[in-house]
Regions:
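Charged, amphipathic alpha-helical coiled-coil/dimerization segments
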Residues: 76, 80, 87-94
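Small beta-strand-rich domains/subdomains or short beta-sheet motifs embedded
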Residues: 11, 45, 63, 69-73
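Short, conserved catalytic or interaction motifs in soluble domains
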Residues: 64, 84, 108
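Short glycine-rich, polar/acidic loop-and-turn segments at beta strand-coil junctions
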Residues: 32-34, 66, 75
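Conserved hydrophobic positions within beta-strands
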Residues: 16, 62, 71, 76-79
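Acidic, low-complexity mobile loops and tails
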Residues: 1-58, 91, 95-129
């Protein structure tokens, strides 16, 4: 059973991204479970401002010591901001995945996609299977 931190204040995707909604802006990152499975994260590649993130498709990559994983957009929208501090200090993803380790902010295109995300308890069920 996992001892991951699963805040109730955010929603989740089954590909281990979290999403926090404020008005029409969504902040996205990877979950505590994902960062712990990856191990020490050494590099992250994020999209440029103005690019389009499409739900279910890759918006970037995260590189750990022994693996590289795609980052999958949990919803669609225009990228408004990318966390550039991660380029110099990717370990923030390991240290604070729901805070300083956030990855991108996008303008929400379709609010119905938010409804389809997982709650904290639904996400916990997935990672504890």
């Amino acid at each position: 059973m996992s001892e991951s931190n699963i805040p109730e204040s955010v929603s989740y995707s089954d590909s281990h991204e979290w999403i926090q909604v404020e008005s029409d802006i969504a902040t996205i990152g990877i979950t505590d479970f994902a960062q712990s499975e990856l191990g020490n994260i050494v590099f992250v590649e994020l999209p440029e401002i103005g690019e389009y993130a499409k739900r279910g498709e890759t918006f970037g990559t995260v590189e750990a010591v022994k693996t590289v994983e795609d980052l999958i957009a949990p919803i669609s929208g225009e990228v408004l901001e990318a966390n550039e501090t991660l380029e110099e200090d990717a370990k923030q993803i390991n240290e604070d995945p729901y805070g300083a380790g956030w990855m991108i902010k996008i303008r929400i295109e379709d609010e119905e996609q938010i409804e389809e995300l997982l709650s904290s308890s639904e996400y916990a069920d997935i990672i504890n299977e």
